[in-house]
């Protein structure tokens, strides 16, 4: 089982790397977001957020997605649109890690860190430092 998990994580990280580069997001930041959101499991769903990057269908539609919600369980599709949203948050935050994850988690127009955002930022920084 461990071998499969490592293989799945490796192929997911290849997808993350490709889309992070295409969207101008540092790989370590993109990888940390996926790890926090789904632990690399493309089948995760929580509160209407789906897949690897836990993106809601309405949010995905806002960055060009036109498929059915279930299509967001596909790793490639999910990361395509999740990374577009993350890249916008990254640009709006001037590349600041905490600002990026705050906007990714709470919406692009969030401008005050809440406790959940602070915890997310701490996790992201720890993951980025260990990668």
Regions found by a protein language model. Name each.
Residues 1-15, 21, 62, 66-73, ...:
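Non-catalytic cell-wall polysaccharide-engagement segments
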Residues 48-66, 82:
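Substrate-binding/active-site groove segments that recognize
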Residues 34, 56-59, 128:
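Short, small-residue-rich loop/turn micro-motifs
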Residues 11, 25-30, 47-50:
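Extracytoplasmic
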Residues 25-41, 79-83, 100-106:
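Short, functionally critical alpha-helical segments immediately adjacent to catalytic or ligand/cofactor-binding
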Residues 43-45, 113:
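Short glycine-biased active-site loop of nucleotidyltransferases that positions the nucleotide triphosphate
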Residues 28, 54-58, 95, 99:
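Generic alpha-helical secondary structure signal
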Residues 27, 49, 54, 69, ...:
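Glycine-rich phosphate-binding loop at the start of an alpha helix
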